[in-house]
Amino acid sequence: MFQQLSASIRHNAHIIFLCISWYFISSLASQVTKQVLTVCPLPLFLGEFQFIYTAVLAWFTCYIAYSFPGFYRIFPNGTFPEYYIDDRETSRAARKESKLSSLIIPPSKPILQTVLPLGLFQFVGKYFGHTATSLVPVSTVASIKTLSPMFILLLQKILKISTLKITLTLIFSLCTLVLGVWIIVQEDNRSPASSNELREFSKYGVICAMISMFIFVLQNIYGKTVFTYRSQTDESQSNSGFSRQESPLPLYEKLDEKLVAKKKPKSYDKLTLMIYISLVGFCLSFGWFITLEFPVLFRYFFQINSSSTVIKAFPVSLFLLNGTFHFIQAMITFHLLGEVSTLTYSIANLMKRFAIIAVSWVFIGRRITWLQVFGLVLNTLGLFLYERCTSQSKIKAKIRPE
């Protein structure tokens, strides 16, 4: 048993290393975001900076992948545009000159139709998420985000999308999840300050965190098909019957290939989507930034009525660090999505939330209470049971005859 465990760890060592790096960088990024918004509480400006900085880093990464095949082959298919005819078994890569001669796929109407909703979700979600982070502890924001399964189920029921069957286990998991989040939020917001203004700000921060979580739930439902990449090679293998199945269990259905091809949305590589989504998000939030926060920045830099400004400092290094962490998180996410199953990624993503909560408690420096630990345990149990329900539902769907 121990030999099998050690062999499994050695085989998946790079995945374990990626997950640990993901948790570490995500936790640091959350703390850096909190520090930035504490001294410079401008959520729109931070979002604008993240959008443009992410687009620049993504373009630069595409340039490296375009110029160096070895770097291109490190990442799973669908991370970059198809620069090369990639044969991973023989370690040979040839430039696809006739297919794509530019760094990213040129803008077109289908691309804009795809990224416009995602850019809008990013803009609104970032604004409320950053606002919440500036008002309440990071652990509060992270714990509220773990409520997303409940809202996903609710939206799927409202939109009449195929969803999980309501069972006692599912109900118990959601109740446990809500109770755990409630305990964490209550404990986090026990502030020594007693002013009504701070309490109102705390309540507003919780509301903003809820809105941000709801927006990103909508984004995940919409983006599920957009970020599912299939290259032409994969499609031809699938049509010829040689594609690798997710499960050894047979699928008892036969679909009209022409109908499937007609209904299936066009898929783009993840870096192209990242660049266009960032640019669209930047453009959508630019007007709001100019109206609401640019006057504040203008007064701060030109020392106009500086005594009343909300900006305590302008930490350029923290802005750059925050944007870099934000981009690295996205690249690790893309790599994991191409290396592990959807269920494994979901569990890893949930574990990331717990890491962010735990690290935020350490950074705050306050004594961790037993109620906080109990709330985190309830949160973990609820999410674990929810994932079990999800995986069992998928297995039953695969073996059910049509």
From Swiss-Prot:
Record's Gene Ontology CC terms? endoplasmic reticulum; Golgi apparatus; membrane
Membrane topology field? Multi-pass membrane protein
Where in or outside the cell it occurs: the entry states: Membrane
For the Cytoplasmic compartment, the record's topological domain ranges are: 1-12, 72-103, 156-165, 228-271, 375-402
Pfam families in alphabetical order: TPT
Query: Could you list the residue ranges that cross the membrane?
Result: 13-33, 51-71, 104-124, 135-155, 166-186, 207-227, 272-292, 354-374
Look up the record and give one Gene Ontology term from the biological process aspect: phosphoenolpyruvate transmembrane import into Golgi lumen
Kindly provide the name given to this protein in its UniProt entry: Uncharacterized transporter YJL193W
- Organism of provenance: Saccharomyces cerevisiae (strain ATCC 204508 / S288c) (Baker's yeast)
